[in-house]
Regions:
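Conserved beta-loop-beta element that borders a ligand/cofactor-binding pocket
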Residues: 70, 90-117, 121-124
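NAD(P)H-binding glycine-rich loop region in Rossmannoid oxidoreductase-like domains
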Residues: 1-61, 71-78
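Short alpha-helix in the Rossmann-fold core of NAD(P)-dependent oxidoreductases
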Residues: 44-51, 67, 86, 139
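A conserved pocket-lining segment of Rossmann-fold NAD(P)-dependent short-chain dehydrogenase/reductase
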Residues: 121-141, 145, 149-168
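Substrate-binding strand-loop-helix patch
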Residues: 137-144, 164-182, 191-202, 247-250
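A short helix->loop->beta-strand "cap" motif at the edges of active sites that frequently abuts
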Residues: 60-65, 97-98
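A hydrophobic C-terminal alpha-helical subdomain
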Residues: 195-273
Length: 273
C-alpha cells in the first residue's frame, strides 16, 4: 500500500551503501540480478560478489532473516556465466548467513514480466515467429506466489533452498502456442537451429560492444542462448511451494489480464467485427 514501502538507492557493489540501507532492518530480501555480462554491474559484481556482500553485512548488523532470490536450474547449467555467478552467489549467501532462505524461481510472470510480454510483442512482427530452444521446458511461476514464499522467509517460518515452479510445464514452443492463442494471432513458428541463435546473439552482442553500450542488445545474448540448453523446471525431491503450503497459480488464470494489449485490436478485439 502507498506509504508502506519506501524506495531508497543502494549500490550493491559498495559495503557502505549496502550497510546504510540494511542497518536497523529485521529482515532483508535480495532480489537483485542482471543479464549484463560487461560494465560495472556485470554478472560477477552483482550476482556473485553482490549477493555475498548483502549476506555478510546483514549478518554483521544482526539482521534476523535473509531471503535471497536466485534462479531455477542454476545448479544444473554448467555453460552460462549467468548460472555460474548465481551459483557463486548462493554459496556466498550460505557461507555468510547459513539460515538464509534461497528461492529458485522459474521464469516469473506478471503484469510487467519479461517472458510472456516479450514473446507476445514479437508475435506482432512479421509473417512468421522465429524461435530458438523450442524444446527447452519451462515452468513459469506467478510473481505473487514468489512473493508469498519470500514473506515466509521474512517472518522466519521457513529457511533453506526452495525450487519454485508453476503448476504447468511446457516446452518453449508449447508456451508460444499459448501466447499466440491469447493474443489472437495465427502464424507459423520457425524453430531455428541453435547455431543460428549463437550467430545472431554474437552479432547483437558485438553491436552493443562496438557502440559502447549505446545500442543495447535487448533481444538475446550469447549467454542466454547457452541457458536455453538447460530445462527450467523443478527437480524431483526439491523443496517446493507444496512444502510452504502455497498453491501455485496457472499462467492462463493471469496472462489474459495484460496480454490483451498485443491483440490486433487490443481490448476491443472481440467486438471488432
Amino acid at each position: 500500500a502507498v506509504g508502506q514501502v519506501e524506495p531508497v538507492f543502494c549500490n550493491i557493489r559498495d559495503d557502505a551503501s549496502v550497510a546504510a540501507v540494511t542497518r536497523g532492518s529485521d529482515a532483508v530480501v535480495n532480489c537483485v540480478g542482471t543479464f549484463d555480462r560487461k560494465g560495472k554491474n556485470n554478472f560477477d559484481a552483482v550476482q556473485a560478489d553482490g549477493a555475498e556482500r548483502v549476506a555478510r553485512i546483514a549478518a554483521a548488523l544482526g539482521v534476523k532473516n535473509l531471503v535471497h532470490i536466485s534462479a531455477l536450474g542454476v545448479d544444473r547449467d554448467e555453460l552460462s556465466e549467468y548460472a555460474r555467478t548465481k551459483r557463486a552467489g548462493e554459496a556466498g549467501v550460505l557461507a555468510q548467513f547459513p539460515s538464509a532462505m534461497i528461492l529458485r524461481p522459474s521464469v516469473i510472470f506478471g503484469q510487467e514480466d519479461g517472458f510472456f510480454n516479450r514473446f507476445a510483442s514479437m508475435a506482432r512482427i512479421g509473417p512468421i515467429f522465429p524461435l530458438m530452444g523450442g524444446n527447452t521446458r519451462f515452468q513459469p511461476v506467478y510473481v505473487m506466489d514468489v512473493a508469498r514464499a519470500a514473506v515466509m522467509g521474512v517472518v522466519g517460518t521457513a529457511s533453506g533452498i526452495y525450487e519454485l515452479g508453476g503448476p504447468e510445464t511446457k516446452t518453449l514452443r508449447g508456451w508460444i502456442d499459448v501466447i499466440l492463442a491469447e493474443v489472437h494471432r495465427t502464424k507459423p513458428v520457425f524453430n531455428a537451429p541453435m547455431f543460428v541463435g549463437r550467430m545472431m546473439a554474437w552479432g547483437l552482442d558485438m553491436m552493443q560492444t562496438l557502440t559502447f553500450g549505446i545500442a543495447k542488445n535487448g533481444l538475446i545474448t550469447r549467454d542466454q542462448v547457452k541457458q536455453l540448453k538447460t530445462d527450467n523446471v523443478v527437480q524431483e525431491g526439491a523443496k517446493t511451494f507444496e512444502d510452504l503450503g502455497i498453491v501455485a497459480t496457472a499462467p492462463e488464470a493471469v496472462i489474459e489480464s495484460y496480454l490483451w494489449r498485443y491483440r490486433p485490436s487490443g481490448q476491443y478485439d472481440a467486438i471488432r467485427d
